[in-house]
Amino acid sequence: MMAKIVSGDDVIVIAGSDKGKIGKVVKILRKGGHVVAKVAGVALCRKSVKPSKDREGGIFSVERFIDISNIALFDSEAGVRTKVGYKFVDGKKVRYLKGSGRVLD
């Protein structure tokens, strides 16, 4: 499955309990025909960790993965969500925002 969102992109959550939150993509997993993304500060859950030699135990907040269909690319300059397209610039394929025409790569 082709996903037009990559690590480092600004995205907005468009469905679920965190709808409307904006964050940066930390990690993308593409396995088994399923694409999920981890977004900084979104879809937080609490995880209990036992103490070990290396670190202290306790309850920590960690980010869960979100399905790629529940997020959309966010244009930080215009302040709106937008779609991404591909075009050739100087013989090189680049991603661009369809709303503003700004080149991402």
From Swiss-Prot:
Organism per entry: Anaplasma marginale (strain St. Maries)
GO MF annotations in UniProt: rRNA binding; structural constituent of ribosome
Pfam families: KOW (PF00467), ribosomal_L24 (PF17136)
Keywords: Ribonucleoprotein, Ribosomal protein, RNA-binding, rRNA-binding
Assembly and interaction partners: Part of the 50S ribosomal subunit.
Entry's transmembrane regions: none
Family annotation (InterPro entries): KOW, Rib_uL2_dom2, Ribosomal_uL24, Ribosomal_uL24_CS, Ribosomal_uL24_KOW, Translation_prot_SH3-like_sf
GO CC terms in record: ribonucleoprotein complex; ribosome
The protein's name: Large ribosomal subunit protein uL24
PROSITE patterns associated with the record: RIBOSOMAL_L24
Function: One of two assembly initiator proteins, it binds directly to the 5'-end of the 23S rRNA, where it nucleates assembly of the 50S subunit. One of the proteins that surrounds the polypeptide exit tunnel on the outside of the subunit.
